[in-house]
A protein has these predicted regions:
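Conserved Rossmann-like nucleotide-binding pocket used by diverse enzymes
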Residues: 32, 58-60, 79, 116
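Non-catalytic terminal and boundary segments that flank Rossmann-like NAD(P)-dependent oxidoreductase
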Residues: 1-31
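Conserved cofactor-binding/catalytic machinery of classical short-chain dehydrogenase/reductase
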Residues: 95, 122-125
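Conserved glycine-rich Rossmann-like NAD(P)H-binding loop of the short-chain dehydrogenase/reductase
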Residues: 53-67
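N-terminal Rossmann NAD(P)H-binding glycine-rich loop of SDR-like oxidoreductase domains
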Residues: 30-50
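Short, conserved SAM-binding/catalytic segment
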Residues: 65-76
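SDR active-site strand-loop-helix element
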Residues: 34, 60, 96-100
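NAD(P)H-binding glycine-rich loop region in Rossmannoid oxidoreductase-like domains
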Residues: 80-118
Length: 125
């Protein structure tokens, strides 16, 4: 596990690894995570990388350099792209976790339709 994270977060991730009851269902599976550098997505990436079973994690990100800095030496594959455009990924994917979202509060007020469209198009793509 990446050691450059807060000790409390590290302890929480270890606890998830110990108590999550469905690890066997994820053994040797691949999980594609949109919004992987966001709050929810990054926690899912870290939790899956801390799993006591082999899980292939594919992080869909807009900025690979930012993602690599965030995840350090964690065993993550990267798919670079924008969630509002069709995803170009040729590998096998067993599960998709769509966590990408517009998070700027101002956007909800100034661009409400685009905010919702981003979430909807991300699901379609």
């Amino acid at each position: 596990m990446n050691q450059n994270i807060d000790p409390i977060l590290r302890a929480d991730l270890q606890r998830v690894a110990e108590v999550f009851p469905h690890w066997e269902e994820l053994r040797n599976k691949s999980v594609f995570i949109t919004g992987a550098t966001g709050l929810v997505g990054s926690m899912l990436v870290r939790a899956l990388c801390a799993a006591p079973v082999e899980v292939s994690v594919i992080a869909h990100v807009r900025n690979e350099q930012k993602a690599r800095a965030m995840f350090g030496d964690l065993p993550v594959s990267y798919c670079v792209g924008d969630v509002t455009a069709p995803v170009e990924y040729d590998g096998a994917v067993d599960f998709i976790l769509h966590t990408a979202s517009v998070t700027a509060s101002k956007s909800f007020v100034t661009e409400p339709v685009q905010t919702l469209t981003t979430a909807i198009d991300g699901t379609r793509n």
